[in-house]
């Protein structure tokens, strides 16, 4: 395999069993490791030594930061940008691929109009809006951001034709994001070129998303709604889920209605057994 970089994964390791595994605990004791994060880091360090000895470089998902990053590792940041930012600030290379902008297995238009997908909502314009180099980085740190990557996980993609449909034209937007300075980007210009690119791809036999007939954002989400409860205090008798907090205690009375999925930060979720139980204090009789 000719690649200089070898992606070793390193994400979503379930460490709970390691805390009671006799062999894991023995290894931690022998290597003077304080916790299971350091045990994972110990393994990643060993894998890197093996790869480096064979002229290769280690690349892994941002969880490889846990317990201490291997000396020469490159981080691929998927759980947001924080992992990549932490990596470059410590002198390591990073590739940005946050799910919010780069996971092409998400719906690209109104879900009711699309083939079944894993979830989410990532239209072309949102992909194009991404900037992989955070404004919080210094010039030197920014140079360690080596680029961006699109990901397409195939649990809901049964055929090559479906794969093409999910990729095109969003991968064109991500490519332009990666090679363009932010100040040179123009969404109207790119959108026009993307429409032409889709026609060209279809003429060559590719199965692309029908950009010309894109539905776009949920109409209700495009403008606030005014009602008597806007701005009023909400008393939560059952808490909202920490996984779906939206904008916290102001969400239900902010007058903002959500887009197609909760990922826009406007949908608040209640998954407790008692579900939704709130009181809205109107401040006066209504």
Regions found by a protein language model. Give the residues of each.
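Active-site neighborhood of glycoside hydrolase catalytic domains
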Residues: 1-71, 78-81, 85-86
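Hydrophobic alpha-helix feature that most strongly marks membrane-spanning transmembrane helices
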Residues: 2, 52, 89, 176-179, ...
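Short, contiguous acidic/charged loop-to-helix segments that flank catalytic cores in large enzymes
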Residues: 34-35, 158, 162, 267-270
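Flexible, acidic glycine-rich loops studded with aromatic residues
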Residues: 57-73, 78-222
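Disordered, acidic Ser/Thr/Pro-rich linker "stalks" and the adjacent N-terminal cap
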Residues: 217-285
């Amino acid at each position: 395999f000719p690649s200089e970089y070898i992606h070793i994964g390193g994400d979503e390791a379930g460490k709970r069993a390691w805390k009671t595994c006799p062999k894991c605990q023995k290894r931690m004791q022998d290597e003077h490791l304080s916790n299971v994060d350091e045990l994972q880091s110990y393994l990643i360090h060993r894998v890197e030594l093996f790869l480096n000895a064979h002229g290769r470089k280690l690349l892994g998902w941002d969880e490889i930061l846990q317990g201490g990053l291997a000396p020469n590792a490159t981080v691929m940041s998927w759980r947001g940008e924080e992992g990549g930012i932490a990596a470059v600030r410590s002198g390591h290379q990073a590739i940005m691929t946050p799910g919010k902008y780069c996971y092409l297995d998400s719906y690209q238009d109104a879900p009711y109009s699309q083939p079944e997908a894993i979830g989410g909502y990532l239209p072309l314009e949102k992909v194009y809006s991404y900037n992989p180099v955070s404004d919080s980085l210094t010039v030197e740190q920014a140079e360690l951001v080596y680029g961006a990557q699109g990901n397409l996980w195939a649990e809901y993609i049964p055929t090559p034709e479906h794969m093409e449909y999910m990729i095109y034209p969003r991968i064109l937007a991500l490519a332009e994001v990666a090679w363009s300075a932010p100040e040179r980007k123009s969404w109207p210009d790119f959108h026009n070129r993307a429409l032409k690119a889709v026609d060209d791809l279809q003429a060559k036999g590719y199965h692309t998303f029908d950009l010309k007939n894109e539905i776009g954002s949920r109409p209700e989400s495009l403008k606030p709604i005014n009602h008597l409860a806007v701005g009023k205090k909400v008393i939560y008798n059952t808490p909202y889920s920490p996984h779906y907090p939206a904008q916290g205690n102001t969400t239900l009375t902010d007058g903002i209605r959500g887009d197609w999925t909760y990922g826009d930060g406007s949908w608040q979720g209640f998954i407790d057994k008692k579900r939704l139980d709130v009181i809205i204090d109107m401040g006066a009789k209504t």
